[in-house]
UniProtKB/Swiss-Prot annotation:
Heterodimer of a large membrane-associated beta subunit and a small pyruvoyl-containing alpha subunit. Binds 1 pyruvoyl group covalently per subunit. The keyword Secreted does not apply. Belongs to the phosphatidylserine decarboxylase family. PSD-A subfamily. It catalyses: a 1,2-diacyl-sn-glycero-3-phospho-L-serine + H(+) = a 1,2-diacyl-sn-glycero-3-phosphoethanolamine + CO2. It comes from Wolbachia sp. subsp. Drosophila simulans (strain wRi). The active site is at residue 186. Its main location: membrane. It is a peripheral membrane protein. This is Phosphatidylserine decarboxylase proenzyme. Its EC number is 4.1.1.65.
């Protein structure tokens, strides 16, 4: 935060600048018109806010990649590689983001980006669980140990038709780091190994980079945590 203003994600700069200019022009025409145009400017500023987070510093913890509400948890088979058709069992944790949530996405666990793919699809409302299978999405595979991966999906919604992912193959990433954003309401799925201890439940509100989704080592549940502010 600087000068009392909230941190703003750079993806929102153009929206906010245009809205601000329109608002200034509107005020020059009439006070009432200016006040009316001020509302979307404030709304854009609020939507693209990017607050710092206290990230738990523990390599065994899988953190929430997004703010929102857990809409579904289920065990699934996921095709890990398009080349050989390999499938593995994962636990899917699906997070719905409303337009009021912070939409900046964060890395759930430290590791290396092993695979990335962008899949075209529909723009079903993100409130529907159908969006996980039918909608346009960015798929990210993170290898946290040799041969062990988790998968993150950024999913577009009815309004959110712009997925931003600032990652590359073989890039080293750290838990809690910002890696992208989905504009105006969306869904983020995270697939964790099926034998992992899931620490959240359906209907629970989660915070990106802070809420613990799962623990890779059940013996470390009571371990004292330290935090990095990112």
């Amino acid at each position: 935060m600087c000068f009392g203003l909230p941190n703003i994600n750079r993806e929102g700069y153009s929206f906010i600048v245009v809205s601000f200019i329109v608002t200034c022009i509107a005020f020059s025409i009439s006070w009432g018109f200016g006040v009316t145009c001020l509302f979307p400017t404030l709304l854009c500023t609020y939507f693209f806010r990017d607050p710092a987070r206290a990230v738990p510093n523990n390599k065994n913890l899988i953190l929430s990649p997004a703010d929102g509400v857990i809409s579904k948890i289920e065990e699934v088979n996921y095709p890990l590689s398009a080349e050989n058709g390999e499938e593995k069992k994962f636990t899917l944790v699906s997070i719905f983001l409303s337009v009021l949530n912070v939409h900046v996405n964060r890395i759930p666990i430290s590791g290396t980006i092993k695979e990335m793919s962008y899949k075209k699809g529909k723009f079903v409302s993100a409130m529907s669980n159908r969006s996980s299978n039918e909608n346009e999405k960015q798929v990210i595979v993170i290898e946290y140990e040799k041969g062990k991966e988790i998968i993150v999906e950024q999913i577009a919604g009815l309004i959110a038709r712009r997925i931003v992912c600032n990652l590359g193959i073989s890039q080293n990433v750290k838990a809690g780091e910002r890696f992208g954003i989905i504009r105006f309401g969306s869904r983020v799925n995270i697939y964790v190994p099926a034998d992992t201890e899931v620490r959240v439940s359906e209907g629970q509100t989660v915070i990106g980079g802070e809420t613990i989704i799962a623990n890779l080592n059940k013996e470390n549940v009571q371990e004292k945590l330290t935090f990095d502010v990112i």
